[in-house]
Regions:
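Conserved substrate/cofactor phosphate-moiety recognition/catalytic segment
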Residues: 34-73, 99
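Conserved lysine of the Walker
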Residues: 25
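Hydrophobic anchor at the beta1->P-loop junction of P-loop NTPases
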Residues: 17
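NTP-dependent small-molecule kinase module
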Residues: 5, 148-227
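Extreme N-terminal, non-catalytic leader segments
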Residues: 1-13
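A glycine- and Lys/Arg-enriched "phosphate-lid" helix/loop adjacent to the NTP-binding pocket
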Residues: 99-173
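P-loop (Walker A) phosphate-binding loop of NTP-binding proteins
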Residues: 20
């Protein structure tokens, strides 16, 4: 019996991994997908026509970049459900508006008109009963010091040259965002309790929690539909 069967995880489940930069989303995505025999869905950065322009001029390209991300994630989410589920997804569609677009608006690198247009578009496309929301959002969290340590350890040039103040702001924005998130069921995992980089095999403990969360959310959904 594999772990998916052992913990009664439906083979059409869609699980998305969320959390700030450096928290371990990609590692968790790969580990869960391998253990559950699910497919993975990763963000396609290399084909983004706005990313390089955006880094040269935030104010000019922030709206274009966010609309591009929204369209790509929407298409990916639709494809996952058309395929029949069985996916673990690295980063959710909800973070684009709740974290990144909001940050650009707050900092003045996205105009009020562009921000309103973007959020209206997001609400019309995503925040409806017709959008295929994930069955579960796993939110990875940890102390700020732990996350900074991970960012420094992986040694990406762009991240190493980014001021600590930026990562602290991002960390705080994520904390506020998840505390108010209710678009789909959430499972919060602390990276200090289940460190996939350090422990021999904590993945079964995580999958057990995933199974319980999915069973609870599906029972709740059935009760709501029966009303």
């Amino acid at each position: 019996m594999n772990l998916r069967e052992k913990y009664h995880i439906p083979n059409d489940s869609v699980i998305t991994i969320a959390g700030t930069v450096g928290v371990g989303k990609s590692t968790m995505t790969r580990a869960l997908a391998q253990a559950l025999d699910f497919k993975t869905s990763f963000e396609k950065v290399d084909t983004n026509p706005y990313l390089e322009k955006f880094y040269d001029d935030f104010e000019r390209w922030s709206f274009h970049l966010q609309v591009y991300f929204l369209a790509e994630r929407f298409k990916e989410q639709k494809k996952i459900f058309e395929y029949g589920g069985g996916f673990v997804q690295d980063r959710s569609i909800y973070e684009d508006t709740g974290i990144f677009a909001k940050m650009h608006f707050d900092k003045g690198t996205m105009s009020p008109t562009d921000y309103e247009t973007y959020t209206n578009l997001f609400d019309a496309m995503v925040m409806t009963p017709y959008f295929p929301h994930p069955d579960l959002l796993i939110y990875l969290e940890g102390s700020f010091d732990e996350i900074i340590s991970r960012i420094q350890e992986r040694g990406r040039d762009m991240e190493k040259s980014t001021p600590i103040s930026y990562w602290e702001e991002m960390y705080n924005r994520y904390t506020n965002w998840i505390d108010n998130f209710n678009a789909c069921p959430i499972l919060r995992i602390n990276i200090s309790d289940y460190d996939l980089m350090q422990e021999e095999n904590p993945i079964e403990q995580i999958i057990e929690k995933v199974g319980r969360s999915l069973q609870h959310s599906r029972r709740y959904t059935r009760r709501e539909l029966a009303r």
